[in-house]
C-alpha cells in the first residue's frame, strides 16, 4: 500500500505531464498542419515551425517528468519525446516524410502519443 503523500505526489506529477502533453499535442498539431501556400519563404517558415514544435515539445515533455511520475507514464513520455526529436532532426537533415524510415518514425510517434493519452486517462 502506498503512503498518501506518495500517492499525492504521483497524482501531481501525472497532472503536470497531462498539462504538458496537451500543450505539446496542440502545438505539434497546429504547426504541422499549417499551410504556407505557394510562397517558398512561407513554406519554409511553416516547415521550420513544425520542426521547432517537435523539438521544443520533446524538451518540454521531458522537463515535466520528475521522480514521482508513475514509471509507465515516464517511459511512454520518454519514448514519445525521443521519436519527436528523431523526426525533427531527420527533417532538418532533409529527410522527407515519404522516406520509409521517416514514415515509420511518424507512425511510431502517433502510436506513442496514443499510448501516453491512454495512460493519462
Q: Predicted regions: what is each one?
A:
Residues 1-16:
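N-terminal low-complexity, Pro/Thr-rich disordered segments
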Residues 4-5, 97-100:
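Short helix/strand-bridging catalytic loops that position acidic/His residues to coordinate divalent metals
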